Amino acid sequence: MAAVTEEPRIRLDPTQTCRIHLCSAGVSVLLDISSASLPWIVHWGAALPGLKAAEAASLVAVAVPHRTGNGQDLPVRLDVMASPHAGWSGRPGLVGDRDSTAWTPLFKITEVHLEPLEPLEPLEAVDPQEGVTDSTLTSVGAGTLFVTAEDPASSLRLAIELELTRSGLLRGRATLTNTASRRYRVQELGLVLPLPAQAREILDFAGHWGKERVPQRRELTVGTHLREGRKGRTGADAAHVLTVGEPGFGFAEGEVWGLHTGFSGNHRTWAERLFDGQQVLGGSELLLPGEVSLARGQSYTTPWLYGAYGRGLDEQAARFHDWLRSRPHHPVRPRPVTLNVWEAVYFDHRLEKLAALADRAAAVGVERYVLDDGWFGDRRDDTAGLGDWVVSADVWPEGLSPLIDHVTGLGMEFGLWFEPEMVNPDSAVARAHPEWIMAPGDRLPTEARSQQVLNLGVPEAYAHVRDQMVALLEEYPVAYIKWDHNRDLLEAGTRPDGRPGVHAQTLAAYRLMAELKEGHPDLEIESCSSGGARVDLGVLEHADRVWTSDDIDPFERQQMHRWTQQLIPPELMGAHVASGVSHSTGRTHTLHFRAGTAVWGHLGIEWDLTQADEQESTELLEWVSFHKDHRRLLHTGRVIRLDAVDPALQMHGVVRADRREALFAIIGAALPDVEPIGRLRLRGLEPEFSYRVQDVTPGAAPHGFRRPPWWPEEQGAVLSGRVLQTVGVHAPWLAPDTLRILHLDATPG
């Protein structure tokens, strides 16, 4: 196969069969490509370092299955589009038609090129003595493969991008273009990634408001495990990362393969196993009827789909975290400790009260102050005013300047709450422009939280919202927007005919975020959606953090934090210290447990600090100071979650990239069935290092805490990484809802 190198691009001859090997961070992707078919992923999994052309040819040969009994005459070679012509009888990657024709296209590759991120290995000539006469192997490190294919009979062109990132994350997307004069209706366009036979257990997530990302497991059996999001947002019940792995896999053990559909609107994510044993992960946008109808020359591009392989869930999560942290727009300055006033005042906006909150916040080390819902229009409760983004003269007769001046005078940034995609029927904008409300026609959808959806797909509505927001950003020094989204998009059509508009609405929301940030480069955005119902890699192309959940109860947050981090790193995960009695669950928790839970994310406070006594304020200051002291480690380190030796005890931590420093939390989740529980083995350390282990938990020891004899006192205990990882140390006794934090520092020598 001829290859032409035009740094940094390598053009490959599409008329000849070729094999491409991408290898980075312990992951290999081997693709077999020929003009007769779309790319076939022969291997996606553990690295194959030093792979040679002859070995690749052999690998391709042994990967072809035999013909099934009474089946088609050629073995099935599953391509990334799950094409039916290749013999795949499961869910196809493309569903569409042109007046009931062109519904099963046969694409032929017309162009292949490769853009390596890492140095190119020399192209290896074919050795005829080994019988490999039809191809060579092109091997690179991280890089992106671009494939263009056409079907002249169907008048369709397909472009596929597959990128292996430096972190070993495999991401892909496809673009379909109509080249005929008649429209082509796209019902679905997605990609699939292959799963090996040993991947037989599924882990994905369920949830609801106040309890997001609840793990659930099941066997991958013949059929389709399909997770659809039809709410116009990611959903509190989203699959999050749909993982299939070796039965019994955990945080450290077992090979796992996972897929995330990076889109904030309607979407599909699935795992499928056929009668012949072939199995895949797939993802796509879920398109409603007529949302994508392509005229000549028009194109539709899928969301990015993200595939993450790892040995254990922690390694899989690290691939997402490392990639997110490598983005040029990833937040790099220390994440400001944030006060959000919502649970302190709700809609009771009084300057005196809010200024007093600012005073108390500054005194405990807060760096950003966020004014939540209730500052605009007639928004005195949640039944009116939404959509009128003008400061209320009734509540703020002098505008927001008196509060903002007070906040910034205390050295804090100022943030403001918006819900740009929503509207109350009782609002000036709804009365003036009822045609901007999304609906299936003449009737309105059922209200949710007394609100409807404002159609940002209508240019005039988009401009109205944008201009009101820009006016506020230009009048006031707003450094941060809490961007909320508090209802599902059900029956969300564009008036007057009611055609579905979720696709256009989602892209318009992205465009509005991008436009605001382009005009205000230092602006940060938080993605909030009834709490944690918009946590995905699509919105994180524009947002700087997500709100994990409206439920700030630390008992619930322990699990939500644990599993939210399967996709996103701690610095993007909003984690707040709330009042002693949870506003969501009614549970009562000590400040020790509330703060000890929150410091592991992007720390914030959502508590009426004017009601905190002196002892609570002093303890809170200690926790905020602790977070700031360790913020760099917490927000750059490798996340470690330990499989429980006993369900009564949980443990997680972060380890610095060079393994010279770590923090671990030991959490009492319940009363154990046995006492003592036994030894805890830490992970992620360097076996040859010696570590000084210290208990650095702020405040006094919690009720019932019983130390084992080895427990580090003030000077700390020195133990090797090998001992800590292989043998372990005896756990302390912790009462439920208490915790200890250990700091590990590699000693010199």
Predicted regions and their residues:
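Catalytic cores of secreted or luminal carbohydrate-active enzymes
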Residues: H592-I640
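Active-site neighborhood of glycoside hydrolase catalytic domains
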Residues: P397-G399, R431-H433, I437-H592, W600-W607, ...
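C-terminal beta-sandwich/jelly-roll accessory domains of carbohydrate-active enzymes
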Residues: N455, A670-G749
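Carbohydrate-binding surface patches
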Residues: G26, L242, A644-P687
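Polysaccharide-binding surfaces and accessory modules of carbohydrate-active proteins
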Residues: C18-H21, V29, W40-E272, S690-W710
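Conserved, mostly hydrophobic/aromatic
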Residues: G26, A174, G297, L339, ...
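Aromatic-lined carbohydrate-binding/catalytic grooves of carbohydrate-active enzymes
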Residues: V332-D467, Y480
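Short Pro-Gly-centered flexible turn/kink motifs
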Residues: I109, V292-G310, P736-L744
